[in-house]
């Protein structure tokens, strides 16, 4: 068993960049039927952060999807020797194959890695502590603080 599995690496689709700016994005489709996604991912700071990443990716000629998987594989604290893994999913078989293949391109440029760091600094105040989502807000190990 893995020590850590990355689940939902595209942050409910927000990291694909397909939704555009927060002000213009529609909550129709996947977000309408997933109120948990609205609460977790539909935040202005997240959309702004994706724009930071998207601009750096455009300069490199890659997508935010490719950059996200490569960042996770080569620049995060994941460690395959500990059994860490990325749960890769897709709505189509071709997308799944692309998601797997994209990691083979290797590490990202410093400019894209820096964009991820800037994006994180921009939105980290809005990011939940996931362990508290499932054990009660403010809890550690299931017990109230």
Stretch-by-stretch model annotation:
Residues 1-56, 129-145:
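Glycine-rich, positively charged active-site loop/lid region within alpha/beta enzyme cores that binds
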Residues 35, 62-64, 113, 127:
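Intrinsically disordered, low-complexity regions enriched in Ser/Pro/Gly/Gln/His and often acidic
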Residues 25, 81-87, 103-105, 126-133, ...:
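Short, charged low-complexity intrinsically disordered segments located at boundaries
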């Amino acid at each position: 068993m893995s020590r850590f599995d990355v689940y939902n690496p595209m942050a409910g689709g927000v990291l694909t960049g397909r939704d555009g700016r927060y002000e213009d994005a529609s909550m129709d489709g996947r977000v309408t039927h997933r109120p948990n996604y609205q609460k977790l991912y539909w935040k202005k700071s997240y959309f702004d952060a994706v724009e930071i990443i998207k601009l750096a990716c455009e300069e490199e000629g890659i997508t935010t999807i490719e950059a996200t998987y490569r960042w996770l594989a080569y620049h995060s604290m994941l460690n395959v020797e500990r059994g860490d893994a990325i749960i890769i999913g897709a709505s189509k078989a071709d997308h799944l194959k692309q998601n797997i293949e994209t990691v083979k391109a290797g590490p990202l440029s410093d400019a894209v890695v820096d964009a991820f760091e800037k994006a994180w600094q921009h939105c980290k105040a809005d990011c939940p502590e996931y362990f508290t989502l499932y054990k009660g807000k403010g809890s550690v190990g299931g017990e109230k603080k």
